[in-house]
Amino acid sequence: MADRTDMLDGGALAARTLREAGVEVVFALHGGHLDTFLTGCRRYGIRLVDCRHEAAAVNAADGYARSTGRLGVAAVTSGPGLFNSIGGISAAAADGVGVLVITSSPPLGEAETRELQGGLDQIAAVRPITKWAHRVTSTSRIPDLVGLAVRHAQGGQPGPVVLDIPIDVGFTSVDPSKLAAAGKPEIAPRPVPPARSIASLAELIDASERPVVVVGDGSLAMDFRSELDDFAEATGIPVFRSGLSRGGLTHGHKLNAGGIFSLMALPALGAGTPDLVILVGASHGLFLGGRRFYPMCAGAKMAQIHLDAAEILSLIHISEPTRPY
């Protein structure tokens, strides 16, 4: 039996696992259900940023993820706290942003007793707008399930996840040597695309006279900023950004050609239209110029690289579809 001083409560276990995952900051709005988690964040050196509304906390985590390419984490309290955050969770879901929302709920043993901030199935409510949502029922499973939440949020096409740690589970202390087996709270390196796809794309580039690259909102999750710089400089191909992109070439780079509407303006400027468009992490729709984008590229071959296989070939024929894993 561990000495009481060696025991860790559920909130500390959650914070420790997030720190192991590289999390440095959590955006939060305090609620008593979260006390052990917030105390655990201080214990393990995770900076807490206090927010005035739960949706703002999730929006801040979303913005952090978009601007850094790292996991954004928000903490909101039980019941109305989580329901106040649904607008932020929905935005992260729509744009494929990796955000982990830590929440809580009334004690498991008080279900159906008109408990404080209870009475509604939180997980059922957020499941349609998340990649994954789960309620922890055992303190010893917290490291395992926090790690799983991290992998769900960042693996494949990123998106929001919700992990509910009920107040009694979060406040219970356990012997750290007796925890359930847990995987690492990180995603494995992505495999490279098939050699055949790379060779086909290289052939398209060699055969083109006016190729362009369009980088989209998925570029941060794909984490290739330095490679994109190297590619542009080696090929001389200009790089444009879709309306949602926070990636692309570094600011001031000579081949940073601006936003998608700069590309669409080329014919009016007498510059002609591209004969090859390479979409990198760019999703079809309004922020790629909507349906006006496709007539402008009617004579061009299209290549697309995207984490989400369902996004490839949507709305338009792609000459070379490439999934980077």
Residue ranges of each PLM-predicted region?
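Glycine-rich, anion-gripping cofactor-binding loops and their flanking helix/strand elements
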Residues: 66, 217-305
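A general structural motif
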Residues: 53, 112-116, 188-200, 260-262
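Acidic, glycine-rich active-site loops and adjacent beta-strand->loop/helix elements
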Residues: 32-34, 54-56, 77-82, 103-109, ...
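Cofactor-pocket helix-loop regions in the catalytic cores of large enzyme subunits
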Residues: 2-32, 140-141, 165-255
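Single conserved hydrophobic/aromatic residue that forms the stacking wall/gate
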Residues: 316-320, 324-325
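Structural signature of the thiamine diphosphate
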Residues: 24-25, 66-103, 127-180, 201-204, ...
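N-terminal cofactor/phosphate-binding cores enriched in small/glycine residues
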Residues: 8-90, 94
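Active-site-proximal loop->helix
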Residues: 40, 63, 105-128, 251-255
